[in-house]
């Protein structure tokens, strides 16, 4: 023992336990046997009949050596590895392949391999061994002299022969109904095949293979990796489930199958993906985090004298011992509670229960669990494990016989360990409560989990580390069971400076809310994390062993039932993200092909040597699942980064074109995507790949030209808006064209909001009929950087409509709010940036639901038979009708998608027929309505010159004619009334005449605002009066007898005028409209309620009592004019414009006419409406008046009741 030990329980190296007996083969523990004679079980002698240490060690050794040559190893490493592999699988002694078969057979028992299958497999394996030795020798010879042509020829020939031989041999190891006992053989053979296929990628080109041959071998490696992985997992699960039983003994066998085939099969399968040299082009560090359980520490001595004879049930043991999926953790302290069993002088102090504390990698707090019975102990032993790793346990299981039966217990344990920070310093702690006179049996963990090699001491060659200890409620039910993790899973999450580092996500220290740890599918080397909603998975810490300036890329192995955006945070700051595709369908099982890699190519650094790193997923639709196996950190060097960027750019460029025609652009490649690929190429290093960059740039330019050629939009790059009325974009005021920025490479547009939804912001263009093909689907698509309430329409037979609100992205630059720029202030698109949401799609197709809030959008429209005479074309409209609305969009395209077939063809034919039927019906209706409307309009004027109104034409008649005109349906598109529709020409013709009538009528009426459409403007008011809406009319309401309304009007002396008033009187009294000059020449129109009798109260006054000497106080010059000045002032207001829609708002309204395209109240507000007739009770009175001066007064009043005035007109008589 070491003199420097800290206490009496700590020693250097393993403790030796003296043997006390050699009679372990048989045990007689019956109550009537003499205890001192019968309880003789040799210490140091393992008699577990299920264990085959040599078989397990072979699997452990091979997996351990493979972990050292993952990725692209050094040539010397590879030669040494193949020498080791051939020596392990084809040694000079007994055939390991046969041992593999026997080992599984012994565990499963009920399923044996037939002699013929066994003999065929062994013979074929022997042949493979010879082929491998031959290949290994040729490989070593060629590696010694790679330029030797003969060596190169020999190795190539032997490689091809061996690869073909093993490809055809593997089916012999998966014979039907014998897959389970052959599983270890199958896994080892599959491993050999995949390693061999890797060599083609490593050396094939040097051996003289063509790039096509090398690529073929690579594709076979990928295909067989999936096939072999799924086979191994499937038959492992099948074999395990077959062993599920009801007793403790069946659980022991079940657990051994789980443990031994994890070591010999699943551990290999977990490493298969890392053989991919294109994914792992440099040495790679992988980690196995799965747990395996050694057998319970109870005496096993035949069917009658073993602990499991009276142990707990299968399910009780499974529930008590096997932990639920959890984050990776390790022990920090063990407290053991001891109880005593005694029969006479025979004493067994046994492990009755324990408390363990454990921690996670850089976790801030510890957790603890309690097992067994911890009350009333005779002693308590505390064993610290802080910064120590236990690599071996030697346990002493005891049996104490009595008249009531045998009591089993664990009476001693030696923990061999190393210091985590000083692995060459070996230490040990032990639990030894004492015993006397009992039978004992040694349980050495090395028997079940042997070291990777016997050529080194155990403290250097160990394969596993103790991670947990569990047991049943009592030691009789289930003795303590040790749980172990593979030594490859470090306990610091250290990132290597010269390797790709794989870190399973279960090695995080804290789960985020919404994340669960689920059992691994068998091929991941451990458990995995799962989320059903967006958010971070877990919080991890990593440690660097090198300079902080080293840059990295992150890669995540994931599975998902939905497209999603995966992000990475470093040191708490979210700075990197990427959009990735779904890998599986909802409800499907997790298989090897369910997993894919999400690579975030942006390079980053760590701010500190110990930094946090978090993987998360942005919000995705409910009902979906996302699983993450691990993240990987890949070193970025200047050369590696340039090569990686070049490869990525090459793939991106190649992906633009179809596989059948390398000069044909894929339909689903958007114009925006081409721009982004061009950015990718332009950012390639001139120093490392100038020639390749030039070649790729020419291909991208060609793709851009193809994109321009197929785009049917005029001026897609927004050189102008409303610049040419016959082509290109037409838009409202306020739209701005912006030059390229960090998001768009070319021009884009900004659409602002509007304060009135009846005057929306709009941008539109028509695709001419001549550009379209019959029975073809077309697609409008583009890129929206940011929008709110953006409405998009495609209109032909009917309207395709979608409203998109796309939240603007956060700053794409790591330094938030600062956009990198070039020397001249241009956007620096090569600066490191976040890869933010570039591939979300919003595709609104027939029968499908559109995904909103996506930067990419697309709408489809189907075109039936084209007709150049009708020239329907397709209207493309962008519109915003809310104050908060806005949009920033570009890279717009309208392209031919595909010809219509099947149901789509039938659907468009039905839509076309329905539209044509409606059109024909509308033509017949329009012909009739137009004739009636034209007659009404013509009746307003004296002749067809439309420059002089009939003498009896009043405002009501004009409104009536306007009503007839507005019966013409579909003059403009209801979606955007600035766009003319089918009947625009005839509507604008007649409406122009109506405007002229209004203009002439207003010029003839000297009184301003005589219809009160502008409230009380131009009227002088005394007392309380009001202008109200009555039946869609503006009417003047006087309800107090002292109220007065007047207007001074300038007239022409010696000319005749007609005063015409339309009004309604309620209640008693009179309503009066008086016209007079300054002192005399007064006349009045009187309105009474003719329903009432002509009897008035004594206090009732009449209009004759009104003073005629009213002052003009309050009149404004703006409301005074001669009739010709009034005409001049309104000339522009009513000037017809045949090229623009109507903007006039008439006074009287009626319900909107029925439009087949739907009601649009804004169309009504702009004059596209009917007008109500005068309500019952209104009468029109008039008188002739001949002024003698240039000014007259119009006064309105009443004596009592309510007087309602609809209009007041003073019309100049014709000469």
Swiss-Prot record:
GO molecular function per UniProt: signaling receptor binding; toxin activity
InterPro entries: Cry1Ac-like_dom-VII, Cry_V, Galactose-bd-like_sf, Pest_crys, Pest_crys_Cry1Aa_dom-IV, Pest_crys_dom-III, Pest_crys_dom_I, Pest_crys_N_sf
SUPFAM superfamilies, sorted: delta-Endotoxin (insectocide), middle domain, delta-Endotoxin (insectocide), N-terminal domain, Galactose-binding domain-like
Record-linked Pfam families: Cry1Ac_D5, Cry1Ac_dom-VII, Endotoxin_C, Endotoxin_C2, Endotoxin_M, Endotoxin_N
Keywords, sorted A to Z: Sporulation, Toxin, Virulence
Keyword Methyltransferase found: no
GO biological process, one term: symbiont-mediated killing of host cell
PANTHER family to which the protein is assigned, alphabetical: ENDOTOXIN_N DOMAIN-CONTAINING PROTEIN-RELATED, PESTICIDAL CRYSTAL PROTEIN N-TERMINAL DOMAIN-CONTAINING PROTEIN
Family, as annotated: Belongs to the delta endotoxin family.
Stated role: Promotes colloidosmotic lysis by binding to the midgut epithelial cells of insects. Selectively toxic to Artogeia rapae but not active on Plutella xylostella.
Miscellaneous comment: Toxic segment of the protein is located in the N-terminus.
Protein name: Pesticidal crystal protein Cry1Ka
